[in-house]
Amino acid sequence: MNIKELTYYIQSANINFLIGSGASRPYLATLGSIEKLLTRLNDDMTSHFEPKYKIAEASIYKAFYDSVIAPNRLYHKSGDDYSETKKNYQNYLITWNSLLNKRHSRILKKQLNTFTTNIDLMIEDAANGMGIELNDGFRGSINPIYDEANFMKSIMQTSIHFQHTSEIPVFNLLKIHGSINWSGYNNHIVHERFWSYYVDEEIKKMGDDRFVNLFNIGSDGRKTEKTYEQIIEGAEELELLYEASEYDAFITEYKKFIIVNPTKRKFAE
């Protein structure tokens, strides 16, 4: 495809992107083996429940929380990996904002749909302060509520001196696996300002030692992922020290996130 053909499609077609977890690298981890671990664990828990499985479940959730969810906290964001990831998202927004501004068609809106399976807040963070319209589907200021009708709106800009009206580019962000800052309230999805607080508190109460570490640490300091069998063995050892019910509060708070957890069942969800 040459530049002329590409220009034609940009000018005359609806523009949609689908981005996955790799877009938030290197700052946030990809799923790795977590999806396979949770899928197998869910199958075992469905066929016959044992306390060790609850401990393993909590441990895998914590590993996912530590690597993908917790780094989105405001005070956590720093370092070269964060800067690189944020810059990549900003380049995406700047480039397409410029292209949409140059769209000549009056039939098509100056909108771009970004569908993402990511539950993180990196693209929202990147857009903050850029002067770019990122529509995440929420309406309202004090207690924003998610409303899909929001994606059908256009934003117009009027010149102060000549009363000339023009449409400005809008990026619609559709998070098809949910988001870590979504919460349920009165049958609505609302913004949760303190999304990490309650899970963090449960982890502090329990301590890291009550969770199975999903990695083996070699003598050289290198980490290798544990197998499913090794994780279950670790859960069996913890079962001798702690009651499985002690993990209930953490699991309950974690499951309040309105997200599709990384298992093969996510395709059904």
Model-identified regions with their sequence ranges:
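Extended, H/D-rich, highly charged conserved domains that either
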Residues: 108-267
